C-alpha cells in the first residue's frame, strides 16, 4: 500500500492505514497551489514535483526537496520551482487542475482545466482509492502509476461495479477504470526515466485505462496481506 501526502510528490509505502470517505488517511491531503493562476499544481505542469517527497509530521505536510531540505516555507518552495506557490491543505472546496491536450507536444499544446473533488486532492471524485494488479503492471515500475493498493490474484478490471470487503471489514465500491495521462511517462528518482512509450502502449492496448478506482463504503483499518473479496 502507498499514500502520497502531497499531490504529485513521492509518497510512502505502508503496512497498515486507516481508510475513510476521502481515501487512505493523509493521502493527497496537501498540494502546492500556483499563486498566479490559482491552479493546483501537478507533475503534468511541473515534472519536478516527482523529485520531491511529501511527509506528514504531526498532521501537517513538509516537503523534502531533492537536496534533502525539509520545508513548508512558501518562499523556499517558490524558489525551487521558479514560480510563486504555497502549500495548502485539502478542504471541502474543489481544486482545479490542468493538463496538456497533446502529451506528445506539451509545449505547443493548449491546456485544459477541470475540477477535482473536495476533501482530498484526487483527480476524480470516482476514485478515492486506486488499485492495480501485479499482472497488469507487467515490467513497469509500480511508482509510475502511483496506486494506493497493489493486489495479486487476477485481473482487476472485471471488478468494476462490484464491492470489495477486506478481512477487517473495510468495504470499497469499485466505480471505474482509471484513465491514464502523461504522468505515467514522467521521470522519477531511482532510475525511472522519461518514457512516452509507456503512455503510448497503455493508450494503444488498453484504451488509456489501467487500474481501478474505488469509493469507500465502509471505513476502517486496512493492512498489507489482507484479502479483498467481492461481496
What spans do the regions from the language model cover?
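Metal-cofactor-dependent catalytic cores
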Residues: 1-231
Amino acid at each position: 500500500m502507498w499514500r502520497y501526502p502531497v499531490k504529485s510528490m513521492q509518497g510512502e509505502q505502508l503496512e497498515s492505514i486507516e481508510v475513510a470517505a476521502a481515501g487512505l488517511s493523509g493521502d493527497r491531503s496537501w498540494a502546492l497551489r500556483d499563486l498566479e493562476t490559482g491552479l493546483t499544481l501537478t507533475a503534468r505542469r511541473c515534472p519536478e514535483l516527482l523529485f520531491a517527497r511529501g511527509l506528514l509530521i504531526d498532521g501537517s505536510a513538509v516537503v523534502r526537496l531533492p537536496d534533502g531540505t525539509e520545508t513548508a516555507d512558501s518562499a523556499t518552495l517558490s524558489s525551487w520551482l521558479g514560480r510563486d506557490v504555497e502549500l495548502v491543505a485539502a478542504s471541502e472546496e474543489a481544486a482545479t487542475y490542468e493538463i496538456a491536450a497533446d502529451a506528445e507536444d506539451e509545449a505547443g499544446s493548449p491546456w485544459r482545466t477541470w475540477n477535482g473533488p473536495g476533501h482530498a486532492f484526487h483527480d476524480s471524485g470516482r476514485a478515492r482509492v486506486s488499485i492495480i494488479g501485479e499482472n497488469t503492471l507487467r515490467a513497469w515500475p509500480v511508482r509510475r502509476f502511483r496506486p494506493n493498493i497493489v493486489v495479486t490474484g487476477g485481473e482487476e478490471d472485471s471488478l468494476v461495479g462490484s464491492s470489495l470487503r477486506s478481512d477487517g471489514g473495510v468495504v470499497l465500491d469499485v466505480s471505474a477504470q482509471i484513465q491514464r495521462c502523461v504522468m505515467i511517462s514522467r521521470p522519477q528518482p531511482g532510475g525511472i526515466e522519461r518514457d512516452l512509450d509507456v503512455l503510448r502502449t497503455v493508450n494503444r492496448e488498453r484504451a488509456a485505462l489501467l487500474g481501478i478506482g474505488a469509493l469507500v463504503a465502509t471505513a476502517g483499518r486496512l493492512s498489507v496481506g489482507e484479502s479483498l473479496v467481492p461481496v
